[in-house]
Amino acid sequence: MPPGTKRLRALGAFSAGLPTRLPEIMLVGSQSFSPGGPNGIIRSQSFAGFSGLQERRSRCNSFIENASALKKPQAKLKKMHNLGHKNNNTPKEPQPKRVEEVYRALKNGLDEYLEFHQTELDKLTAQLKDMKRNSRLGVLYDLDKQIKTIERYMRRLEFHISKVDELYEAYCIQRRLQDGASKMKQAFATSPASKAARESLSEINRSYKEYTENMCAIEAELESLLGEFSIKMKGLAGFARLCPGDQYEIFMKYGRQRWKLKGKIEVNGKQSWDGAETVFLPLIVGFISIKVTELKGLATHILVGSVTCETKELFAARPQVVAVDINDLGTIKLNLEITWYPFDVEDTTPSSGPGNKTAALQRRMSMYSQGTPETPTFKDQSFFRWLRLSVLSALRDTFFATLHHNHSVGDLPSLSLNPKALLEFYSNLPDDIFESGKAAEEKRPLSLSFSDLQDGDCVFTSSSATSPSSSHSAHPEITITPAELTHSSLSSQNEGTEDSSSASSRNSLGEDHEPKSHPKSDTVEPGKPGVATRSGTESLFLESSVAEALLQESDEASELKPVELDTFEGNITKQLVKRLTSAEGPVTTDKLFFEGSVGSESEAGRSFLDGSLEDAFNGLFLALDPHKKQYKEFQDLNQEVTHLDDVLKCKPAGSRSRSSSLSLTVESALESFDFLNTSDFDEEEEDGDDVCHVGGGADSVFSDTETEKSGYRSVHPEARGHLSEALTEDTGVGTSVAGSPLPLTTGNESLDITIVKHLQYCTQLIQQIVFSSKTPFVARSLLEKLSRQVLVMQKLAAVSDENLGNITSVVEAIPEFHKKLSLLAFWTKCCSPSGVYHSSAARLIKQLEASFARSINKDYPGLAEPVFRTLVSQILDRAEPLLSSSLSSEVITVFQYYSFFTSHGVSDLETYLGQLTRQVAMVQTLQSLRDEKLLQTMSDLAPSNLPAQQEVLRTLALLLTRDDNEVSEAVTLYLAAASKNEHFREKALLYYCEALTKANLQLQKAACLALKSLEATESIKMLVTLCQSDTEEIRTVASETLLSLGEDGRLAYEQLDKFPRDCVKVGGRHGTEVATAF
């Protein structure tokens, strides 16, 4: 350890006893190194860099420009570290998209931590039971103490998760208020100018500014709960790049945090560095920038490379070993071991002052006083006392009181909260937040009546459409490998938590009151089972789709019975909708299938819903963005998918809501605040006399008197549908609109499923094309498939835009289908009238059996089912026939069906089935024969007569994987002889190279052996990529195949062998694009 290095005490959980080097944090303004800006970054799986050499140079220059700042004296490093640690600087502009991404990643990491410790706790508890009979008292005491330590740490993790959820819920509320204020600004800007309008606009501008400040303050508070990253230097790796005596300097920048270290390559191949590890504090808006420079002399420095890396994937419970491509060619890689701790050093270190020690002791006693193994965790009951100060109640009551009394929007700023007061609300909470026994006693059912509902109209809240960003940022790919976790490190982590201090927050999961129920309605029987709901703020906006008819009120609404809810089961509005949708209700005809349809079809369809449209779009953009400039087909696909995304976000009034057809007026802009009406039910005052029944308040929505209802509707003329609108906004039940967290939908379930399937297939094709980009003939074949998908996306966008998905004829979706009447007639039998766009694989095979099984079994007994499964796998572009058990979950779209037969020139299904039957018969023969008969059969079959069909090629390749050397040699000689036919060799080479891009490991291994038999030197580049697989068996087979391909293969293998193999799946780069993942 060089001089000047400082030590920290053990870092939280897993690093007890490990010295940690302080980060060299300079108070220099952070550079804006994201070319697309934080808002231009979609959710990514990669620790990545931004492509483009010019952007790289600009980032490198920004480091060089700060060279003078780097030479500042470092006498106050610890103080600077503490300043950065607390991060008191609030951002100037909120970044809601980035906050959502970081929140999801943080929540997953915390859940992973909790799951890991729960597993360890179960293991120790079982061990304790086994040891009680024959162990000494001292051993039992130590084990019991260890169990209690883990329990305390788990409670702290659960409390930390609740604080994060609280902040995120408050952030979402402020974001929606900001959106509402923005719409109000637009409404007043387009309305006739007057003095009152100008005054109201001024007030709204102030409100908008305060909402923005609130969001920024919450972002800063959330950032302080992200924990810390411990980064350990593992060294540089590179082929023909690292020579003895070379000196390198690595400079890492993360916001205001800096780390610079120098290293030298020794003669024996080892590396010496002046810094071993450092600590970086996670940021919400910020990426790690890494610059590597080679030091040649006093004034000669050569820039090796500079990358900017994503950090979301670093929120994991286990240490991760990552390999970062530094230069464009990927010949220099930086190996780091990164460990994330959910609690930072200062949180786990007792304060030095006597007063602080006392406060810390009190908080510790408050947090851990119930420390027996039998104390329930948050999974069993809530440990929070409901705090009566609620951000939501303050905003809601103020807003509706203003509307009710003043009938003016000029007082909207009264909705805002002071940013400092908001922070104090979350930071200065009482210490004694945990209760041991009151939670279970306070749990009481809540009964609500829906007699307020009279009108049958169901209005869903609308929102202005926003187009997705046309350009997305690309990140360098980085490989992640979990490091080993020792038992001693776990113990040290848990023991380190005993000195931790606790904070507290209000509980969003329960209330200890019982609002008044409808006096005239009957209560639900207490014996009936409750509704299973998802608790916690993680599901603040549920992504579920429900028919509008389930939310419409009937004429006999007054006869509806009250709904019994549980105040400890999370958001009450969500429970209401869950209960409504789970009860018997009217079912629309477009949701039903005709009699005789496959029962699992609807289940298979539902598996693609629940927000999967957004997931499919995000997954496609994630795979496409780093490479969209590489091929013209990628650019065309990006254009069509973006257009389709815009169409779904800009649905006309008929498929969205009644209010979306209104012009943007002040009245319609006020609908943005409807979520304040029913999004939560805050506690009434204890005496029950101070309840404010303001028009538009939560109580008035479910009130029993016509006076209150008419009073509220007189304030807002559009109030008839506000209940259903508010339910849609707060629960995610209903149709998504742009700018809202509700799920996308076309309004037709079958069309939604079809879009998801094709988006997923395009994502798969993109990954295969990128993998085979260095082998042109393979990439060209895959690009042809992608071009057909681009045309499908055009048709899907047209159908979604013009007809709103309400098509009852396949010809309307594919006009060319009328030219293939036999195929059209068969598809009509397979799909239901309510789902013309898709059919389940089981239903398709059932119809094939009814139509063609007899003729096939007549010539080839028992072969009908394998033939049909093979056909389905070909339509779906699968590597091998589907298993019978997976048929019910597979979905075939009408575009897949039509595209397959069109691309293969098939106009008559029966003729094609006859050809396919002969192929399957040959495959069955080869697979069923024993080794001696197999050799005889292959000797009788002339290689020149061998059909170059994928089923035959796949079977021959799989025969090469048999343990029998004689069979393998015979198949090898057979393929070598058959490859003399140029047509056969071309088809076989294309199939086997495409098989290398599939996810089937057995098929990849077989394809490598087949390419070895064909002596396919054209596949060298793909085999080089496959040699970096994370599966040892695949790497071995690919390496052997490389070495068998002559001098070119041997040279490629020697170059590959220079790279270290301790890091899994090290990615490469394509052109100027970075392709490495964190």
Curated annotation (Swiss-Prot):
It is found in: Cytoplasm; Cytoplasm, Cytoskeleton; Cell projection, Filopodium; Cell projection, Stereocilium. Expressed in the cochlea. Expressed in inner hair cells and outer hair cells and Hensen's cells (at protein level). Expressed in the brain, cerebellum, spinal cord, retina, heart, spleen liver, kidney, bladder, muscle and lung. Expressed in the cochlea of the inner ear. Keywords: Cell adhesion, Cell membrane, Cell projection, Chemotaxis, Coiled coil, Cytoplasm, Cytoskeleton, Differentiation, Hearing, Membrane, Myogenesis, Phosphoprotein, Signal transduction inhibitor. Disruption phenotype: Mice are deaf at 4 weeks of age. Show abnormal hair bundle morphology and polarity and stereociliary growth in the cochlea of the inner ear. Display mislocalization of protein TPRN to the base of stereocilia. Show reduced mechanotransduction currents in hair bundles of outer hair cells. Mice show impaired neutrophil chemotaxis, increased neutrophil adhesion to endothelial cell and reduced neutrophil infiltration into inflamed peritonea. Display increased chemokine-induced RHOA activity and mislocalization of myosin light chain MYL2 in neutrophils. Induction: Up-regulated during regenerating muscle tissue. Residues 509-525 have a biased composition (Basic and acidic residues). One of its GO terms (molecular function) is 14-3-3 protein binding. It holds the Pfam family PL48. Phosphorylated. Chemokine-induced phosphorylation in neutrophils occurs in a PKC- and AKT-dependent manner, resulting in RIPOR2 interaction with YWHAB and stabilization. Phosphorylated by PKCA, AKT1 and MAPKAPK1A; in vitro. Residues 488-508 have a biased composition (Polar residues). Transmembrane segments: none annotated. Acts as an inhibitor of the small GTPase RHOA and plays several roles in the regulation of myoblast and hair cell differentiation, lymphocyte T proliferation and neutrophil polarization. Plays a role in fetal mononuclear myoblast differentiation by promoting filopodia and myotube formation. Maintains naive T lymphocytes in a quiescent state and prevents chemokine-induced T lymphocyte responses, such as cell adhesion, polarization and migration. Involved also in the regulation of neutrophil polarization, chemotaxis and adhesion. Belongs to the RIPOR family. This is Rho family-interacting cell polarization regulator 2. It comes from Mus musculus (Mouse).
